[in-house]
From Swiss-Prot:
Belongs to the baculoviridae LEF-3 family. It comes from Orgyia pseudotsugata multicapsid polyhedrosis virus (OpMNPV). GO terms for biological process: regulation of DNA-templated transcription; viral genome replication. InterPro entries: Baculo_LEF-3 (IPR008415). Disulfide bonds: none annotated. This is Late expression factor 3.
Amino acid sequence: MMAAKREHADCGAEPARKRVKENYKRVTGKLLSKMTISLENHLYYTFTFRLLNENKTEAYYGNLQCFKDLVEQECYDVSLNFVKTKYNERIEINEYSKCDAAIDENVAVKLCLTRADFENEEIVNVLAKLKCVFKRLGANNYKMVFDINMQDAGGAVFVQQVECFANLKVLASAAKAFVKSPDNFNSLMDFYYKNTNTLFYVHGVRCQHTSKGQNEFLNWTAGPSTSLETPSNTDNEDYINLVHSHSTNNISRANKHLKSMQLSLFKAEQKINDNGKHSFSVQFKTLDSMDDDDDTKWHKCVYYVDSNGNKEDPNDTNAVQKLAMDFDQLATCLADKLTKATIFVTADNADASTMNLLGLLKHDDEECEYQFL
């Protein structure tokens, strides 16, 4: 298959192109993902390749014909144009043909990470244990949580939690090898929910390092090239260490770690302080006793409403009232055994009974139905 050369005027209202360095480079790679981006009345087509026998990915722009022709997980020879306009410059696919060259699937996978990986904001492929995927209450962003092996400056290895920023489209792309219809939300969440504590090779996540005051935070960010793969080498100390370890420290937070637990009972009381800030005092019981505590004990956590704190803002008021109703409905449904639910909390490292509520997931895993509050 060979595509015609790109027409230089196919970008609609874009400014006239000043210079095109045609076929400045040729690459061979496996197409990991393709996606469209709509921005300021322009539709952009983007393609992410894993380059032949190289431990890296690169992303290029293309056109509609590329999007129709190129098939994910196939290998292509691609020639690239460097295009410079008055306002920007970018690398675009010019010509492409399917090739039979075998991509080296044995991409180097790290079994543990170091602080330097985060400080240098490296893009890594790494062994990790999936702990959960959750969505924050009242927000549209998702997070994946993993256990990983972290090596300190002295060479000692400890299992730590790390959180990974992702949107729904990235979550779907990452699970493409395991989910038949990853764009179906229920199918996608069913995969992530049922693979808690499963080990994967996590490909193409970017390490990030931020600081606030005396605290430093290490995170991952997932992107279009991020993918999950079943580990091929399970006979090593690092793999076995992850299988049998349970982290109680989260490097993405200060002196906290994250827990997810299946609920048996739930109740919430709305509160408001003198400054008009809303919060909910939450109590819950879990199906499995937490940390070998008495399973009749009510566990406690707090949820602070992220609002403008403006008593006159009807949007704030309505959002709080809707959340109170959702909590009340969840309490009734659990008590009447009409639904199942999982709670996501942060727990203090020094006192695991001190918890803040992050998110709630209602689910019927037999019917493959999932809904985040």
